[in-house]
Amino acid sequence: MRFDVVTLFPDMFGLVRDQGVTGRAHAQGLWALHAWNPRDFTQDVHRTVDDRPYGGGPGMVMMAAPLEAAVAAAQAARAAQGLQAAPVILLSPAGRRYDQAEATTLAAGTGAIFICGRYEGVDQRFIERCVTHELSLGDFVLSGGELAALAMMDAAVRLLPGVLNDGDSALQDSFNAALDGLLDSPHYTRPEVYEGVPVPQPLLSGHHANIARWRREQSLRLTASRRPELIERARGEGRLSKADERFLAGLAGERKS
């Protein structure tokens, strides 16, 4: 797994390369990260990467040539390692919403090249010539694509075998297919009673079937309350059991009473 990032701020990526579980995995060689500054691919003394927009308007636009040259260098470096050409992902408000399914797909591949835009955006001709995918974190605007790229890489890298100490941890994440795309249940640790609030009794029972059912019901309860569209999606995909449906019907009755 190799990620390449085209960015004006390569130092920002030390956060995912050097810290936490992703940093440990990087040190172990489970994935690699290479940053490419488009200023290194300019032809003028000022290392210019942006210019005024045609048609007028506020702000500046990132120029196509330095970005395309940086992508070409990244693809060449990948080819030298025997890797196939990578998808080129532009972080953009116009992109498809990144989710756990996208992270899983990304983790199953050999990596990607992320384009981190700045200013008002990037020249459309670069997008049409080089970009294969556009992705977004959500309906809000950041100062640049770096934070989005960090989040997307973190979500994908933690799914790689050997990255997490317990390989089953990722299976219990919210939105994971192992949870049928639902939200995860609440978690508790020591002490058994905190500020007068005890750990729920089923978790102390040692009865694995009861614990599993309690967690499933709490997952259903939380998802129905916070993200009801995920319940409908799971239902439409046939992921809800008869016991799940009975519990949800009971929740609906509670809300009506």
Curated annotation (Swiss-Prot):
Keyword terms, alphabetized: Cytoplasm, Methyltransferase, S-adenosyl-L-methionine, Transferase, tRNA processing
Gene3D superfamilies in UniProt: 3.40.1280.10, tRNA(m1g37)methyltransferase, domain 2 (1.10.1270.20)
GO biological process: tRNA N1-guanine methylation
One function term, GO molecular function aspect: tRNA (guanine(37)-N1)-methyltransferase activity
SUPFAM superfamilies: alpha/beta knot (SSF75217)
Subcellular location: Cytoplasm
Chief location category: cytoplasm
Enzyme Commission number: 2.1.1.228
Reactions the enzyme catalyzes: guanosine(37) in tRNA + S-adenosyl-L-methionine = N(1)-methylguanosine(37) in tRNA + S-adenosyl-L-homocysteine + H(+)
The keyword Mitochondrion appears for this protein: no
InterPro entries: Alpha/beta_knot_MTases, tRNA_m1G_MeTrfase_C_sf, tRNA_m1G_MeTrfase_TrmD, tRNA_m1G_MTases_N, tRNA_MeTrfase_TRMD/TRM10
Residues annotated as transmembrane: none
Xref: CDD domains: TrmD-like
GO cellular component: cytosol
Alphabetized Pfam families for the sequence: tRNA_m1G_MT
Function: Specifically methylates guanosine-37 in various tRNAs.
Assembly and interaction partners: Homodimer.
Family label: Belongs to the RNA methyltransferase TrmD family.
Record's protein name: tRNA (guanine-N(1)-)-methyltransferase
